[in-house]
Design a protein with these regions (language model features):
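Proline/glycine-enriched tight loop/beta-turn segments at coil->beta junctions
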Residues: 1-2, 78
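Catalytic nucleophile-elbow at a beta strand-turn-alpha helix junction centered on a G-D-S/GDSL motif
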Residues: 3-27, 92
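Conserved SGNH/GDSL esterase-like catalytic core that processes O-acyl groups on lipids
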Residues: 22-100
Length: 100
């Protein structure tokens, strides 16, 4: 088995609306069991730590809590073989452009 993989990010990585929901994840996270971090972990044999969260911004990755969850970077412990960061859309306010 490959090593530890930590996925950080917003809804672009969490995969809200893609069923099934990731077991044990907070409902508000919108985390799918079929999001790309889960697919990478499954195909490559990684032990996945998925802390992606819908609505997250760069601040939620680095310093701020989000819906009572700690900053996502706290999931890193130095043993990771792979870390992905998928964030930025919420920082630039992309949602209004989707509904315009």
């Amino acid at each position: 088995m490959a090593g530890r993989y930590v996925a950080l990010g917003s809804s672009m990585a969490a995969g809200p609306g893609i069923m099934p929901r990731a077991q044990g994840s907070p409902r508000l996270a919108g985390r799918s069991a079929r999001n790309y971090p889960h697919q990478i972990a499954e195909r490559q044999g990684y032990q996945l730590v998925d802390v992606t969260y819908s609505g997250a911004t760069t601040a939620h990755i680095l310093t701020d809590s989000h819906n009572n969850e700690p900053p996502q970077i706290d999931a890193l412990d130095g043993t990771e073989e792979l870390v992905t960061v998928t964030v930025g859309g919420n920082d630039v306010g992309y949602v209004p452009f989707l509904v315009a």
